[in-house]
Amino acid sequence: MCSHSQRVLPKRIILVRHGESQGNLQPTAYDTIPDPKIQLTPEGIAQARHAGHRIRHVIAGEGSTNWRVYFYVSPYARTRSTLREIGRSFSRKRVIGVREECRIREQDFGNFQVQERMNVIKETRQRFGRFFYRFPEGESAADVFDRVSSTHFFFNYCNGFLESLWRDVDMNRLNHDPSDDLNLIIVSHGLASRVFLMKWFKWTVEQFELLNNFENGEFRVIQLGSGGEYSLAVHHTDEELLEWGLSPDMVADQKRRASASKGDWNDPCSWYLDAFFDHLPDSDDDNVDKHDETDSLSECS
């Protein structure tokens, strides 16, 4: 077993959305079927199986023979079925293990979802804002963000999924041989995957709301770059990132991460600076101080 000082980082973290479900094909299915019990359609099964082939090609395509996979899966029927189909592409010796993880489940839309009511609710969400709007008797995207990352509930500290994932890696709970490339595959839902990316890359709410949802059976590859930073741009093209809704600044940030040295790279966070400090002058502190003194004198005269 690896000691904490021998921490071996995953080479890839792959986020997968489930295949087409009954609810995707016919939204009225939610009127009578609980969301966690919604099944895949035949097309969804085919999409999931194809995703497995493509994911294996991503992992094995670089020529390495020393690689293993570990799966995390949402407890919903459609994600569990997606995992079973993806798993057909991997032999048992390649799979370290699998864990059902409730914190990466679908956003709670409020029990049975009668379509006439949901249409009104979703129109209200568009006006209110997709991230902060909380469905009646359900969750907001911000609530999903909290359980995917971490949060405090009164005096009880609740670990988010991402925090638990890193603790698994740190303590080698995955029983991973450090000589093998480790690939973590997270089979989940569109929103849970997008807030995972938001947390990972420290994106703002405004940036999150630019993102397009994953297609059914689609995946994103977060891969370790040459300098030790994770990035979407190691595997994916600029065109793909733009198509998924990333702004040009966000794409440029991913490209920096892909080649930056972990010790030298600092997050420039230009979007934070521009959002909060666009009114500040570019001159040095001395000139700013003199300007402030002049303003003070003029106010006193």
Model-predicted regions and their roles:
Residues 2-94, 137-143, 148, 301:
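Active-site-proximal alpha-helix that buttresses catalytic centers in soluble enzyme cores
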Residues 76, 105, 189-190:
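Short beta->alpha junction loops/turns
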Residues 43, 74, 101-104, 222-225:
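Structured beta-strand/turn binding interfaces of compact recognition modules in eukaryotic regulators
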Residues 22-26, 34-39, 86-166, 235, ...:
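Phosphate-handling substructures
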Residues 12-16, 72, 178-192:
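Beta-strand elements within well-structured catalytic alpha/beta cores of enzymes
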Residues 66-70, 95-99, 180-184:
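Residue-level recognition of the N-termini of beta-strands and the immediately preceding loop/turn
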